[in-house]
Regions:
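N-terminal Rossmann-like dinucleotide-binding module
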Residues: 1-39
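Short, conserved structural micro-motifs that define repeat-unit consensus positions
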Residues: 2-11, 62-63, 142-146
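Beta-loop-alpha module in the N-terminal Rossmann-like domain of NAD(P)-dependent dehydrogenases
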Residues: 11, 43-102
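Short active-site oxyanion
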Residues: 21-25, 58-60, 164-165
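Rossmann-fold dehydrogenase core element
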Residues: 97-115, 135-140
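Predominantly a Rossmann-like dinucleotide-binding segment in NAD(P)-dependent oxidoreductases
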Residues: 116-196, 204
Length: 208
């Protein structure tokens, strides 16, 4: 597990409940902070290269700040490791292509940790849509509101160049679910207002 901040800690507590998974190491640049959360559960590292060198690892779970996802994912895939990565996958299309290329060339699995599609109510909607029990789904309206995140390390989430802002950090949940139900859209239109005075906005329309 790389990064044990907000989402990293959530993942850490989930791994403790999975009987057929063994968490072999945690890596975070804040060693004292990590030790406080991990305790004696597993070794703690501050350097990902040292962790990958010393431990026998099947899967690396990347829960670092978003702007670090691409570099770490490519490194782990190139070392022959499967990767689970917190959303967003990357902050640019170019970096996403690099990650996909590394996954393809390595033959290893890469998954973005989109959680919404696995939530019971969302999974049920997809199931009845796939089965056609309620007829054809012709429109899907999804809305999401959130306060500005103020809990991140060094406030990186408030920097849209590091987090991707409301588009890649928040709206991405709904975009992923829509695509899981309806597939890739034929075209997309969107309007966006950058973060200003604690307010940001995006409206996306996916056409099928």
């Amino acid at each position: 597990l790389v990064g044990i901040g907000g989402m990293g800690n959530v993942h850490f507590n989930c791994y403790k409940k999975i009987k057929n998974a063994e968490l072999v190491a945690v890596c975070d640049v804040r060693k004292d902070f990590a030790l406080e959360r991990v305790g004696s559960a597993c070794p703690v590292y501050t350097d990902i290269d040292e962790m990958l060198k010393n431990e026998e690892i099947d899967v690396v779970d990347i829960c670092t700040p978003s702007y670090l996802h691409a570099e770490m994912a490519v490194e782990c895939l190139n070392k022959g490791l499967n990767v689970l990565c917190e959303k967003p996958m990357t902050l640019t299309c170019a970096d996403a292509e690099k990650v996909l290329a590394a996954a393809e060339s390595s033959g290893k699995k890469f998954m973005v940790a989109h959680v919404v599609r696995f939530m019971p109510q969302y999974a049920f909607l997809k199931k009845v849509t796939d089965e056609g029990k309620l007829g054809k789904l012709i429109s899907l309206d999804m809305r999401r509101l959130s306060s500005v995140p103020r809990w991140s390390w060094e406030n990186w989430m408030q920097d849209e160049q590091k987090s991707g802002g409301v588009c890649l950090d928040l709206s991405v949940h709904d975009i992923d679910f829509v695509q899981s139900v309806l597939g890739m859209p034929e075209r997309v239109s969107a309007s966006y207002r950058p973060l200003k005075n604690d307010s940001s906005f995006i409206k996306s329309t996916l056409y099928y």
